[in-house]
Amino acid sequence: MRYLATLLLSLAVLITAGCGWHLRDTTQVPSTMKVMILDSGDPNGPLSRAVRNQLRLNGVELLDKETTRKDVPSLRLGAVSISQDTASVFRNGQTAEYQMVMTVSASVLIPGRDIYPISTKVFRSFFDNPQMALAKDNEQEMIIKEMYDRAAEQLIRKLPSIRAADIRSDEEQTSTTTDTPATPARVSTTLGN
């Protein structure tokens, strides 16, 4: 029985390791993006701190924005908006629950290539208890901080797809340059009489 349990555990480990499964909160950042510049209008803001923390957790070395290196990809954080909509109401018509939506836009500039826009949305529910105003404010601040962390995780998770899009655009450019003939094809301008 002990050997069977060991065999099943070993098989489970091999299957999860072989299929590319990774632990949560770890992203395979492409090797070309292991050194990056983080550019933000508010470098000490909550989103910048959360993104900087996620990049460091994923083994990305961050360079100063004023660096002289121009061959390094740059993650530029854009606008952040937080909206709050009523999700449910009490019998008396007061708001009982809010749905908060955080929208974050950013772009990745790969030198000599292109600018790739990325965006993410994070949704959270927030219960509004009118009898506990102070606790409500503290809870809302905690939820917003958590939303910044989740948005940063989602932005970092999109970095491999940007690398894939960059490779795909390179392949398309090489195929269009090899497929075009050396002399332009003759185009008829008559209406086919």
From Swiss-Prot:
<comment type="similarity">
    <text>Belongs to the LptE lipoprotein family.</text>
</comment>
<dbReference type="GO" id="GO:1990351">
    <property type="term" value="C:transporter complex"/>
</dbReference>
<keyword id="KW-0449">Lipoprotein</keyword>
<feature type="compositionally biased region" description="Low complexity">
    <location>
        <begin position="174"/>
        <end position="186"/>
    </location>
</feature>
<keyword id="KW-0732">Signal</keyword>
<keyword id="KW-0564">Palmitate</keyword>
<protein>
    <recommendedName>
        <fullName>LPS-assembly lipoprotein LptE</fullName>
    </recommendedName>
</protein>
<keyword id="KW-0998">Cell outer membrane</keyword>
<dbReference type="Pfam" id="PF04390">
    <property type="entry name" value="LptE"/>
</dbReference>
<keyword id="KW-0472">Membrane</keyword>
<feature type="lipid moiety-binding region" description="S-diacylglycerol cysteine">
    <location>
        <position position="19"/>
    </location>
</feature>
<comment type="subunit">
    <text>Component of the lipopolysaccharide transport and assembly complex. Interacts with LptD.</text>
</comment>
<comment type="function">
    <text>Together with LptD, is involved in the assembly of lipopolysaccharide (LPS) at the surface of the outer membrane. Required for the proper assembly of LptD. Binds LPS and may serve as the LPS recognition site at the outer membrane.</text>
</comment>
<dbReference type="GO" id="GO:0015920">
    <property type="term" value="P:lipopolysaccharide transport"/>
</dbReference>
<feature type="signal peptide">
    <location>
        <begin position="1"/>
        <end position="18"/>
    </location>
</feature>
<dbReference type="GO" id="GO:0001530">
    <property type="term" value="F:lipopolysaccharide binding"/>
</dbReference>
<dbReference type="InterPro" id="IPR007485">
    <property type="entry name" value="LPS_assembly_LptE"/>
</dbReference>
<feature type="lipid moiety-binding region" description="N-palmitoyl cysteine">
    <location>
        <position position="19"/>
    </location>
</feature>
<feature type="region of interest" description="Disordered">
    <location>
        <begin position="166"/>
        <end position="193"/>
    </location>
</feature>
<dbReference type="GO" id="GO:0009279">
    <property type="term" value="C:cell outer membrane"/>
</dbReference>
<dbReference type="GO" id="GO:0043165">
    <property type="term" value="P:Gram-negative-bacterium-type cell outer membrane assembly"/>
</dbReference>
